[in-house]
Amino acid sequence: MKHIFLKTIILSLSLVAVACQGEKRRGDLSTLDKPFVESYNNERADAPNTSDEDPNTNQRKTVKVKQGLEIPIGKANVPSLLLYREGYTTSYNADTRTPNWVAWHLTAAHTNGPAKRKGITFQVDEDIPEPRVDTYDYMRSGYDRGHMCPAADNHWSQRAMEQSFLMTNVCPQNPALNSGLWNSIENQCRTWAEEYGDVYIVCGPIYLNQKHKTIGKNKVQVPEAFFKVILRLKDEPKAIGFICRNVSAKGHKKTDYVNTVDEVERITGMDFFSQLPDNIERQIEGKADIKDWN
């Protein structure tokens, strides 16, 4: 377990270095105003239930989960255009030319289905204002077009599969990370969805520095890292987070990148799974152990 918080330590050291230079890091909560809410308010008729034990009665009390549980509270003063897709919701940032976050509810049924990936190419998202990122921005850049919501999570619907290839669902990602550790985490999420029936997922880029490398004519900003947080409700509510540097993770395991959701919130300035009752949210976001998921 000694490597579990490896990436958190590295990110924390980055924060110290930036602070010493007198710069403000985008993920430093001390530089942010009170975040604005980007969430749904309508309850879903078939919303799943979770439960928590009442300490006064030792009885299990049922908690109704609202629609949009996966939608986070975003950072203040950050460009955000909400785009609602068949299989996910994304907050697009016109400054970075990447999503702030992408969120989706992954069910066991979503991991299998008739939708095929073959023949689908990455597409410009016509729903955003110009300049629009296109696939040519990534050509010979040294970075993959890294899906945030993976195509493999959208086999349940051909439309959802096609929309997963919109450029607003993509970030510049190190090729070895994309095909290696990040892909392994994506596969793990699908396994969890099959095991527990469904999971709620949020992921996106982390911009640590004041200035960032850019690629392409549209100057897509390259993130320094990526985050992913996952929530399950079946049996007993559990949450887990991952933070991965945007470099090759060859030689490392998923467990080396596990973080609590609280730590991911501290680094990103976001609030995840805020529709949960406060006591449950505090309980599950303050600890993370991948053994609890196996």
Go through each PLM region and give its residues.
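Domain-level detector for secreted/extracellular nuclease and nuclease-toxin modules, and
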Residues: F5-K7, A19-N294
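Hydrophobic h-region of N-terminal signal peptides that target proteins for export
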Residues: S12-A19
